[in-house]
UniProtKB/Swiss-Prot annotation:
The keyword Nucleotide-binding applies. It comes from Pseudomonas fluorescens (strain Pf0-1). Keywords: Aminoacyl-tRNA synthetase, ATP-binding, Cytoplasm, Ligase, Magnesium, Metal-binding, Nucleotide-binding, Protein biosynthesis, RNA-binding, tRNA-binding. It comes from the Bacteria. This is Phenylalanine--tRNA ligase beta subunit. PANTHER family: PHENYLALANINE--TRNA LIGASE BETA SUBUNIT (PTHR10947:SF0), PHENYLALANYL-TRNA SYNTHETASE BETA CHAIN AND LEUCINE-RICH REPEAT-CONTAINING PROTEIN 47 (PTHR10947). One of its GO terms (molecular function) is magnesium ion binding. Binds 2 magnesium ions per tetramer. It is found in: Cytoplasm.
Length: 792
């Protein structure tokens, strides 16, 4: 919300300077983002009047003007297309200094003397208009200092409001806050009801009362929209960063800024029959005021006539029903559209308007009539015309209702760490427009006004007290609690421990958004319907992630684009999966790796990381809680992973994650020019381990046997190891695969697996007969179950 300081001080003017006011607003939770001067730095500019003009003798586009400053007449050469006798303009006299250290001196233009300069808005930095002179009203006082005339010793203050403070998106709301902060009186403009000068009306039907509980309309005839908007209004709009369009649009924008109620003016001649507020028909077309044609969805509320949609309710009007300079009769709309009905609709159509910004945050449902009367009065004053009666349709059952709140002094003391005087509590809350009455000893009954839709609980009232009293004035009180130590399950590994493990293995932690681009969701999950947000932050953050990979890969791309060739990232967070019984939110831990296996160094090679390097990292995570033997890696399929480098990770038959290389087609789509490996694990499964069992170290020698086995190339090494474990007996202490070979001397459909087995008995030495017998059992089982034989 951006506004003029002088406009605000017209409502409430505490005896403090600008800096103090800005600081107090920020401390009260209305954070001031910027304070900018209302105009550039200039001096020596007065209100001038062009008395006469004549053609320059040597230049077709220049005019020689006689300009008065109220006391003298000066000859000025000007090339502006709109210069003419009788025009009043900003006149920079000799010696004036304009923005950019530009000094006005006597000069000759094509041989004709020029004593000053006639100025445009852009030259004085009071607007963007540079296609001609700034035209002042006919009643402008010639000779008056231009800065004084336009009250340019002003500033535009921009306040960054949190979404719950929609009540401050107006001068009325801001003035109410300032008045409460400084205990200063607030002078609200007196809005008089405009009597009807004719009886013409248009019928209003609200077919979606839950979305539009209140709708007001009024016919205003014989307006003259060719009349200019008064300069005082144009300036207030400009200082609020609102561009002047025409009188009707400017007035609706002005009232919106002043009171907080969005309004809309329709060209009455373009309305067929009456007004119908309804839900759009699926695929219904509407060309908006910005020229964009949209295809409406059935969940969009529209204002329509009897034949077509006229506007997206609370967002933007249609082009064909908008007012123009030729409009003679206007239908003025002032409505209360439900917050939920409007929320997200603007963004879903790629729009963001001042009206939607306010409706999404909440508009005072009792404000519509006052705003209608205020806009009508201004419209008649500026453009002429006659107003008809107000037509109002209300659905009382759908209007918001706020129940009274009980506020306890004990709770205030508990939360703020101090006792607050009862009179002070009542004064602060009354200053905000809340009705406070004592309700027994040490408590109050508080009625919340319609403009404070963010207050519904006792803690909300206490927050208001803290804001107005001043956070910086609250005493420091440390919390006291009796905390007993919590027993930790020894068979679990906490997330912080897993984080430290991955950091120790060369990873860096990343935090990415849970919202992703639906297009990116489709790349990682082709054919799967994404979970779309009803009110996304932006179109490229409209889907909930079903995996942590999209965010991690995006972070990887960001680093690769900045010459980081070795990237190892991990993240822990929720994934969101739609199920028949509802949304499943599951904590996951995932990683992405690319680049060299080891950091660059003189004694280290530059080998590129591969699948088995990442598998080793995953095994370290899986084994951290002591349950690595419960996990298995099996060949798997995943649409985002390389079909030949993908493993499904299982725990006792349950799928707990995936590991693999990014699919080549996906890499191409993402612009990745090197191998990228990823893993993702269900955090609950990873964290759950088992208690280790301790045994006395054996003092007897180990016995080792190495077996070279021939198996079909499609037989997984894990399957071979599982069969060996099942038949190796209880004294097997170590089993490892140390070589895999395919090539010369072995059939093309076979491969050689070399495994090492180590046995050790805790209380005696194993003899060869025992080991040989066990080895033979292993070989027999391998041949029977996997057709794997000893290599000869």
């Amino acid at each position: 919300m951006k506004f003029s300081e002088q406009w605000l001080r017209g409502w409430v003017s505490p005896q403090v300077d600008r800096d103090a006011l800005v600081a107090r607003l920020s401390m009260a939770g209305l954070e001031v983002d910027s304070v900018t001067p209302a105009a550039g730095v200039f001096s020596g500019v007065v209100v001038g009047e062009v008395l006469s003009t004549e053609q320059h003798p040597d230049a077709d586009k220049l005019r020689v003007c006689q300009v008065s400053n109220g006391a003298e007449t000066f000859q000025v050469v000007c090339g502006a297309p709109n210069v003419r006798p009788g025009l009043k303009i900003p006149f920079a006299m000799i010696g004036a200094e304009l923005p950019g250290d530009f000094k006005i001196k006597k000069a000759k233009l094509r041989g004709v003397e020029s004593n000053g300069m006639l100025c445009s808005q852009a030259e004085l930095q009071i607007g963007e208009g540079n296609d001609g002179l700034m035209e002042l009203p006919a009643d402008a006082s010639v000779g008056e200092d231009f800065r004084v005339y336009l009250d340019l010793e002003d500033a535009s203050i921009e306040v960054d409001l949190t979404p719950n403070r929609g009540d401050c998106l107006s001068l009325a709301g801001l003035a109410r806050e300032v008045g409460a902060l400084y205990d200063a009186p607030v002078t609200r403009p007196v809005v008089m009801a405009v009597p009807a000068a004719h009886d013409e009306v248009r019928s209003v039907e609200v077919l979606a009362p839950a979305a539009c509980p209140r709708y007001l309309g009024r016919v205003i005839r014989n307006v003259d929209l060719s009349r200019p908007t008064p300069l005082w209004m144009v300036e207030r709009l400009r200082r609020a960063e609102v561009r002047s369009i025409d009188a009707a649009v400017d007035i609706t924008n002005y009232v919106m800024l002043e009171l907080g109620q969005p309004l809309h003016a329709f060209d009455l001649a373009e309305i067929n029959g009456g007004i119908r507020v309804r839900m759009a028909e699926e695929g219904e077309k509407l060309v908006l005021l910005d020229g964009q044609e949209v295809s409406l969805r059935s969940d969009t509320l529209v204002v329509a006539d009897h034949t077509r949609a006229l506007a997206i309710a609370g967002v933007m009007g249609g082009e064909h029903s908008g007012v123009s300079a030729t409009t003679r009769d206007v239908f003025l709309e002032s409505a209360f559209f439900d917050q939920i009905a409007v929320a997200g609709k603007a963004r879903s159509y790629g729009l963001h308007t001042d009206a939607s910004h306010r409706y999404e945050r909440g508009v005072d449902w009792q404000l519509a009539r006052e705003a209608m009367e205020r806009a009508t009065g201004l419209l008649l004053e500026i453009t002429g015309g006659e107003a008809g009666p107000i037509i109002e349709t209300v659905s009382e059952q759908h209007l918001p209702s706020i129940a009274p709140i009980t506020l306890r002094a004990q709770r205030i003391t508990q939360m703020l760490g101090m006792e607050m005087d009862s009179a002070e509590v009542e004064r602060l809350l009354n200053a905000l427009g809340l009705k406070v009455s004592a309700d027994g000893a040490g408590q109050w009954r508080v009625e919340v006004p319609s403009h404070r839709f963010d207050i519904s609980l006792e803690v909300d009232l206490i927050e208001e007290l803290a804001r107005l009293y001043g956070y910086n004035r609250l005493p420091v009180r440390y919390p006291q609690a009796r905390l007993a130590p919590q027993a930790k399950a020894e068979a679990r590994s906490d997330l912080p421990e897993l984080r430290r493990l991955l950091v120790a293995r060369g990873y860096q932690e990343a935090i990415t958004y849970s919202f992703i681009d639906p297009k990116q969701f489709e790349l990682f999950n082709p054919g799967v319907e994404p979970l779309l947000l009803a009110n996304p932050i932006s179109n490229d953050m409209a889907a909930m992630r079903s995996s942590l990979w999209p965010g991690l890969v995006k972070a990887l791309q960001h680093n690769l684009n900045r010459q980081q060739d070795r990237v190892r990232l991990f993240e822990s967070g929720l994934r969101f999966v739609g199920q028949l019984e509802g949304l499943k939110q599951e904590p996951m831990i995932a990683g992405v790796v690319c680049g060299s296996r080891l950091p660059e160094g003189w004694a280290q090679g530059r080998d590129t990381v591969d699948f088995f390097d990442v598998k080793a990292d995953v095994e370290a995570v899986l084994g951290f809680a002591g349950a690595l033997d419960q996990f298995t890696f099996a060949p798997g399929k995943h649409p985002a992973l390389h079909p030949g480098q993908t493993a499904r990770i299982e725990r006792e038959g349950r799928e707990v994650g995936f590991i693999g290389a990014i699919h080549p087609e996906l890499s191409k789509s993402l612009g990745l020019d090197r191998p990228v490996f990823v893993f993702e694990l269900v955090l609950a499964e990873v964290a759950l381990g088992k208690m280790p069992k301790f045994h006395e170290l054996s003092r007897f020698p180990e016995v080792r046997r190495d077996l070279a086995l021939i198996a079909h190339k499609d037989v997984a090494a894990s399957a071979v190891l599982d069969v060996i474990r099942e038949n190796a007996g209880e004294w097997l202490t170590d089993l490892r695969l140390f070589d895999v070979y395919q090539g010369k001397g072995i059939d093309t459909d076979r491969k050689s697996l070399a495994v090492g087995l180590t046995w050790q008995h805790p209380s005696r030495t194993l003899n060869d007969d025992e080991v040989n017998s066990t080895t033979q059992n292993i070989l027999t089982s391998l041949e029977q179950r996997l057709n794997a034989t000893l290599r000869k």
